[in-house]
């Protein structure tokens, strides 16, 4: 990214292929130290990473050391992700993500009876490195792996475990109704009793194969 492009680091990062789920965090939110409490203990090269996010001039030593620059870039991406997880729980962040949700930017539920219900990104852990981002369907209330492989390497901690639930607590009017229909397995037109599979498993577990005689 060259300085002549006049594109902020945040806009550049959110515009990268695979980062479509992110919204652009307001710089004034990032500049408020209260919002970043504790992150300096989680992110290496914290000060340099923060300067990079805010487009502040890097140290001369950093410019002369490309290996160090790569480490700072990685730290900046991690720091932005953790800031993003906090930001999308605020009113401003929710408003930005709600707009993306309404546009279907996060994809649609693959479940047939959810009828193309838009989904929201969610993390299965708030700790970085534990799980990649998943998609939550507010209709069937289940989670799915993103359809596109380019989203399979986005850390779920950058969205957090509570984001979709916070959004619908703030905006209950956007919470969809539960699905009216549910798939019913049938065989020759007849419904399969829910106990059928359980009885089949019990029968299989109690079945003992004959022991061959040793000659």
UniProtKB/Swiss-Prot annotation:
GO terms for cellular component: cytoplasm; nucleus; protein kinase CK2 complex. InterPro entries: Casein_kin_II_reg-sub_N, Casein_kinase_II_beta-like, Casein_kinase_II_reg-sub. GO terms for molecular function: metal ion binding; protein kinase regulator activity. Coiled coil: none annotated. PROSITE patterns: CK2_BETA. Phosphorylated by alpha subunit. The KSSR motif is part of a protein interaction pocket that mediates interaction with cellular and viral proteins. This is Casein kinase II subunit beta. It comes from Danio rerio (Zebrafish). The gene is csnk2b.
């Amino acid at each position: 990214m060259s300085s002549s492009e006049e594109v902020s680091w945040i806009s550049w990062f959110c515009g990268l292929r695979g980062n479509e789920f992110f919204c652009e965090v307001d710089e004034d939110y990032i500049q408020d130290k209260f919002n970043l409490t504790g992150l300096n203990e989680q992110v290496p090269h914290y000060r340099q990473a923060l300067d990079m996010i805010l487009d502040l001039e890097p140290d001369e030593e950093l410019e002369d050391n490309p290996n160090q620059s790569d480490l700072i870039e990685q730290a900046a991406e991690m720091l932005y992700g953790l800031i993003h997880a906090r930001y999308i729980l605020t009113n401003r962040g929710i408003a930005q993500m709600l707009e993306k949700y309404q546009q279907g930017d996060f994809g649609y539920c693959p479940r047939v009876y959810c009828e193309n219900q838009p989904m929201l990104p969610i993390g299965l852990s708030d700790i970085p490195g534990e799980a990649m981002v998943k998609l939550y369907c507010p209709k069937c209330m289940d989670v799915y792996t993103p359809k596109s492989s380019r989203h399979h390497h986005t850390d779920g901690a950058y969205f957090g475990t509570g984001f979709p639930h916070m959004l619908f607590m703030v905006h209950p009017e956007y919470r969809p109704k539960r699905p009216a229909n549910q798939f019913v397995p049938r065989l020759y037109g007849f419904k399969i009793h829910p106990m059928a599979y359980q009885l089949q498993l019990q029968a299989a577990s109690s079945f003992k194969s004959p022991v061959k005689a040793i000659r």
